[in-house]
Regions:
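An anionic oxygen-ligand recognition environment, strongly enriched in 2H phosphoesterase
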Residues: 96
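N-terminal, polar/charged subdomain of small-to-medium soluble alpha/beta proteins
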Residues: 1-93, 101, 105-151
């Protein structure tokens, strides 16, 4: 599983042209899924990172607070392009990502796991929808997570 994390002041998402979900301050997490990601070990590792990363400023201006410390939310959005391979040619290959049906199930399972265990409000996008996302980035702070710890 790969996740791009962005610290946001607010985010709103439309799916297939219709308003779908919104959130105030917190983390917007773009989630890419590969085969084999649908297990509790992966879910626990990634969710623990998401809710405990200290990327929000404390009273001294130091990034020392998590969404749990701040009472902020988590917004999960599926994004298959995180497994795009641009090393050869000019069109990315997405063969490293999980097949659509498997990815859909893993995303829904991860979303349910996050809602049950995050300790924070969890918002979401709609899997395989055409989504328009309006964000107000804070910082900007953008980080990468990989369950295989490649980076």
């Amino acid at each position: 599983m790969r996740i791009v994390i962005q610290r946001v002041d607010r985010v709103s998402l439309a799916a297939d042209g219709e308003p779908y979900d919104q959130m105030g301050p917190g983390i917007l997490a773009m989630v890419g899924i590969q085969s084999g990601d649908g297990n509790e070990k992966t879910f626990n590792y990634m969710l623990d990172k998401l809710v405990n990363l200290r990327i929000f400023e404390d009273e001294n201006g130091k990034m020392n607070r998590s969404i749990l410390d701040m009472g902020y939310g988590l917004f999960l959005v599926s994004n298959f392009t995180l497994y795009g391979d641009c090393r050869h040619g000019r069109r990315p290959s997405y063969s490293s990502g999980a097949p659509v049906q498997e990815a859909a199930q893993i995303y829904e399972d991860f979303l349910a796991y996050a809602r049950a265990h995050a300790g924070a409000d969890v918002n979401s996008g709609l899997f395989q929808a055409d989504m328009q996302i309006d964000t107000h980035l804070s910082g900007p702070v953008t980080l990468l997570l990989d369950s295989d710890k490649n980076f």
